[in-house]
Structure formats: structure tokens, C-alpha cells
Amino acid sequence: MRFTQIVAAALCLGATEAAVAPIDRARKVLGNQHAFDKRDASGDTAKAPKHLTSKNKKFYVDPNSIPGVPFDIGESYAGNLANTPAGNSSLFFWYFPSENPEAKNEITIWLNGGPGCSSMIGLLQENGPFLWQPGTDGPVKNPYAWSKLTNMVWVDQPAGTGFSPGPPTVKDEIDVANQFSDFWKNFMDTFDLHHSDVYLAGESYAGQYIPYIASGMLDRKDSEYFNVQGITIIDPSIGATEVIIDAPSVPALHRFNNIIDLNETFVNDITKKWESCGYKKFMDDALKFPPAGPMTVPGKSAGCDVWDEIIAAVKEVNPCFNIYHLRDNCPSPSNVMNGPKNFFNNKQIQEAIHAHPTDYRLCGESQIFGPHRNDRSVPSSYGPLASVIERTNNTIIAHGDLDFLLFTEGSLASIQNMTWGGLQGFQKEPSDKFYVPYKDGSEVGGAGFVGKTHRERGLTWVTVDLAGHEIPQYAPTAAYRMLEYMLGRVQSLTETH
């Protein structure tokens, strides 16, 4: 190009706009501060505890004593309470009373799954008063802490999990429910919470734990200790593995292969195998509204572990693929809960929260349910879940769409094969839009239309588009809204005002 042409081109450009660096354009729109940088890590003036008594003082946690946390975490109590009448075993808890006046006569229990995974990860990385999440450089206050709404307790259970010393003794979910109920009675006595409304929430294998625990509590017909008013189970394990993992895995692969990026030959081959294993017919039948009738679950056959084959192929393409959040790529973010030097495997922290000295692991190798980790109880959707829905009229099953271990369609298929309130499954396909209001702080959690929701006969179904396995971690505002709904603070998940 001649010099005169270059000058002419420059003059032409100057008539419209000068060259602008793309990063300057981005800064103008987005600002210089990452949304997560807006979260508060400043110190506070400690407040006098309002709930301290002679019965619970040994569990009181100094709010400024947690190593590495540079601010007051608020009033809390932690330690172990017996989970058997004989007192020869115990469960660890961390309890945060709420300052919300509407929480006066209620308490919500949070359980993580596994089996054998500590609920402290829920506290530290999902919905606790302070968070240290993967890829972040330190603890911050959580603007969407569930303790802002209700009295919250995170519990390591069953025995042998996290800070709850073993050996594990449970063989099935009836044992789990009995063990937890014995602990719960001690907890309610210790903190004078008698006659409180009790809510249970959790994720993953807590989809097995919680319906059995709630059912066991309701069976006792004792409102002084066990006044269960509702449950929420997130990305739950509620059905046979063929239903919640294998059958929905290939449809999910087709849906998300623009992200997962497996080649056409593999996708075609695994789809043919999925069809020959009977999974296609099952899913076609399961996702009809209303369902035509009870569905036979395909049995586990040789060569039909299609999810396993998909994951093996995905790992070749993306070595850092995260089954809990399918959009993750390399490098994997650092995580303070991983490895032997994890946050809770610290003598000073263990002393601060009155935990027994423990070589703490997030998900231990303890033999929950015996040496083969074989839970003898049937999946909760075949067992007590329907009864809990009927008896509480307040059950939420929620699913993050980006989970690639337990699939949205698998949970929905389990619901469609379950009978409650005199009918099988949902009679209408879920289609209402789940709305999260815009408010201060939503820049760190999102707002607007975030998924779908549907309610029939006491069961509310919720999906969250941009969340993985742990909805409170990936979509804290959506999780907070669901909690508001379970507690009765809002009457709808679709209202836009």
C-alpha cells in the first residue's frame, strides 16, 4: 500500500473514531474491579453473644479466633454431641444463630453427601457466613449466607465423616436416621430450641440421607424436637444409578457437546450403545407429562456403563474436566479444601471450633455402610421421599444444569416414576421461569431469569441454568431464593417484583 493510501485510510478512520485498545473498551463497560473483588473481607467490631448460656458455653466459638480469617465471623457454636443414647459416639456441628427476627422459631440443617463427605465444605465454599472458594486468595464474608435468613447448623454425619469420630456403624438409612435423631435431640436440648420448625437441606448423597432422616423425625410425632416443615435436596441422589447417571448421560452429551467437544465418531458409537442398553426407550417414556404408567428401570448390563466411557473420552480432550461443573477447563483452580494441608486440617482451627484432633479429609475413605460402601436402603424416590412430600407439603428438588455426574434429566426421570398425592409424576412439563430479583450484592451471584420451576402436590422442581452440582456455590442468589421459598418468606419463585 502506498503512503498516500495509508494517509487516506487514516483520515477516513479519523472521521469516525480513533483506534481504541480493546481492554480500554472492556474497562469502560465492566469497570476495573472483578465482581468477586467487591466481596467484603473487612474487620468488624465484635458483638456480645445473644445466645450464650451455661449449657452451651463450652461450644462457643470466639468470632475472631479462626486462623486466616481476618474478620469477625459472627456468633457461633461448634463441637461434638452424642448421637447414641449410650453416648459412645458423636456428631460434629457448627451452629450459627441468625440475627434475622423471622428466624426466631426455626432452624435449618445443612448436610453434604458422599457418603462420607464433610458438611464443612458446604459451610466454607457454598452457603456459610464466610467463604473461601476455589481460585480465590482468601476468606470473604458471604452476602448470601443462609444464616442471614435462618438459624443454620452444618453437621458432619454419619459417624466417621469429617470431624465426627468413627468407627462407622451405620448399615443403611434407617441407622442414619436413628443416629441423627439421637444427636438432634441433644442439640435441641443444648440450645433450647424446643418446638422450633425444622428444615433440612443438602446436596448430592444428602438426597438419600435427608428423606430418610426427615421421615424418621416425622414418624416420631414429637413436635418438641422433630417438627419438620420442609426439605430441599440439590442435585440429589434419589434414584438408581442407571436412572440418575447412565440413562441421562448421552442426552446431556448431545446437549453440551459444543462445550465438551467429543468427535462425531465417538458420539455416534456411544449413542448406539445407549440405545441398545435400553436407556433411550426409558428416557423417552420417563420424560412424558403425565407419565403413561410405572416404568421398568433398565438393569445394569455388561458394556452399559456409558457414562464411564464418556468421561474417559472427555478426559482425553480436557484433562481438567470437572464432572461437577462441565464448563471448567485447565488449569484447575487451587482449592483450600484439597489435600493434606486443607483449611480444616489445622491444629489451631480445630482447637478454635472444639473439634477432636483429626487428620481431616473432605471426603474420607472411612467405610460408611461397611467395607464396600453398600447402602442397604433403596433409593429415596423408591422409599420415603413421596411420604415426606405428602406430610410436609413443602419439598424442593433442585438441579444445576451443568452437573455432569447427577443429571437434571435423571432427577426428573426419577420424579416421573414416583407416586405421591394420588398421582404418578408431574402432570405438566416444567416450563415456568425461575426468577431471582435484582438487589444489592447480586453482582456476585446473578439475577433475573435463571432457570425453570414447577410445583405440583407439594413438590417444587427447580433448575438453575448456570450452576453445577453445588448450586449455592455457583449460583448463590438462586440458592438463597430457594431457601426463602422453603421458609415461607416468599410465596413464588416466578414473581418478577
Swiss-Prot record:
Parts of the chain that traverse the membrane: none
Residues annotated as the enzyme's active site: S204, D403, H469
Signal peptide: 1-18
GO biological process: proteolysis
Disulfide bonds: none
Cellular compartments per GO CC: extracellular region
Keyword Protease assigned: yes
Keyword Cell wall biogenesis/degradation recorded: no
Principal cellular location given in the protein's record: secreted
Record keywords, A-Z: Carboxypeptidase, Glycoprotein, Hydrolase, Protease, Secreted, Signal
GO molecular function, one term: serine-type carboxypeptidase activity
EC numbers on record: 3.4.16.5
Glycosylation sites: N88, N263, N393, N417
Protein role: Involved in degradation of small peptides.
Family from the record: Belongs to the peptidase S10 family.
Protein's name in the database: Carboxypeptidase Y homolog ARB_02032
